[in-house]
Amino acid sequence: MRSVPVIAGDGRQSPPSLSRLRLLVFAALFSGLSACGLLPAEIDQTADWSAARLYTEAKSAFDDNNWEEALKYYQKLESRYPYGRYAQQAQMEAAYARWKDGDEAAALADCDRFIRLHPNHPSVDYMYYLKGLITFNGDLGYMGYLSSQDQSERDPRSAQESFDALRELVTRFPQSKYAPDAQARMNYLVNMLSAHEVHVARYYLKRGAYLAAINRGQYAIKTYPNTPALEEASYILVLAYDKLDMPELRDDALRVMRLNFPDSRYYTQGLEPKKPWWNFF
């Protein structure tokens, strides 16, 4: 508990007690010794380890999913042996470990740094792939049906970032072993981005913002052709033009829709809730 200074009769504070002076002297002395390095420091057991041993310990922790421990060794390896194959391998694995440890921003920064420093590395394609995985907010639909969340309602920024990274991978390295999975994820992401635009168009339609609904629907049709959400986008155009009392544009939109979707359920069911496009069961 902090002591309260005693006020003398003339209004002056009384001098601090002797015990308090001793504490202040000891604290100052301890700080001085620490600053001069006279006190024993904690011994780093890894101080004389080779790059190979540091990497072996890091990889062992990595394989056990002990991301924090792995990162500790990777950081020591990079700081002591910044050049060579061990350092480069550590940089790649550290990016993955940071992602799995929950630090997506640092993981993305690691990927960008590696790509910038080692553009001709034989495994640089993996770093583009990892960038796509870090920002990929989906599961290719394999287990998505277990969740009731509508993917189209999610913030599309990370999906767009993931798509851009994966597209760069398949463009730069079409023969990469990661390219097939990257392409499958890109297909999923395009469908999700399209569904998001249609979700926004439906939102505007329900709230009477018909021109905004038309703009969103048209954008989805032009930007994401051949995606499942375009059927609904086409129907939204028909409804919005009808609400705006534009019969010619409505009939033209309906004609195009009947040409592309002759058996659409929207003709009889309207905009009723339906299963998400990724929900197969």
Q: Where in the sequence are the language-model features?
A:
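Acidic, polar-rich low-complexity tracts and alpha-helical solenoid repeat scaffolds
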Residues: 4-6, 32-281
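Bacterial N-terminal signal peptides that target proteins for export
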Residues: 3-25
